[in-house]
Amino acid sequence: MTTSPLANPTATRELLEEFGLATKHRLGQNFLIDNHVIERICELAELAGDERVLEVGPGCGTLTLALLQEAACVTSIEADPELEPVLDAHAADYANFRFIMGDALKVTPEQIEQAAGGEPTVFVANLPYNVAATIILQFFQTMPALKRAVVMVQREVADRIAATPGNKTYGGYTAKLGLYAQVTGRFEVPPRCFMPAPHVDSAVVRIDRVEGVAPEELDREFVARVIDAAFAQRRKTIRNSMSANGFAKDVLDAAFEDCGIAPTTRAETLDVAAFVRLAQELIHDA
């Protein structure tokens, strides 16, 4: 059973007061104060002790201290410079902890690899909700050694990540993430598990990398372009949406016929495999 000494209101408040800190709503910080949630996150992550874990938004280190008990090393990225002294104190206590100060969307994979002593293999985080979806997709796109992610996100984001074709929350983001990974686990987290309590509900999702979704030789950025064009005008047919966003109608018609996709189809009914097939046909004319 993995717990954190900071996962309660008193310990979190005392640590913040020790360093003269108040919560920073502008950075989306709501500190996790429930050890049951910490335990479930660690269980879902299935850490065996040899992983290089990447974390974003460690805050005061509540989840970090639990992960350090389970992983070979933990590398955290924190945007708030006022939290640097707190993380420095943790680094002094744990030889397997290192951190990078900066914006997770701007820190390069090379910087992360250098800090971690190798490519990260697992991503575990209580993510800043305003950038969570973007971070998840970007990390799977740019870090090929990343096997899985276990992340806390706003419930609506979790719904988007896990959506299936035909569901109203299924969209271009879901399909693009599906080129790299799929959801394999989830549990809900109520607002009372945080300090201060957020005004939204949260969920933890596990996302595992999948192989073989698209042929290695197929440019996934082109597949993403196809997906974006298909969803650009969601209420229109896929033919009308894509023809208004960079694809010629005659080329589209030939590709639809070869793929067995009706031009009157709407993008939200197609799975990732269908977009891959469509991209394979269209890339010859790109």
Question: Model regions: which residues?
Answer:
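C-terminal lobe and adjacent flexible extensions of AdoMet/dcAdoMet transferase-like proteins
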Residues: R209, I227-A286
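Catalytic cores of RNA-modifying enzymes
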Residues: M1-D228, E257, E268, R277-H284
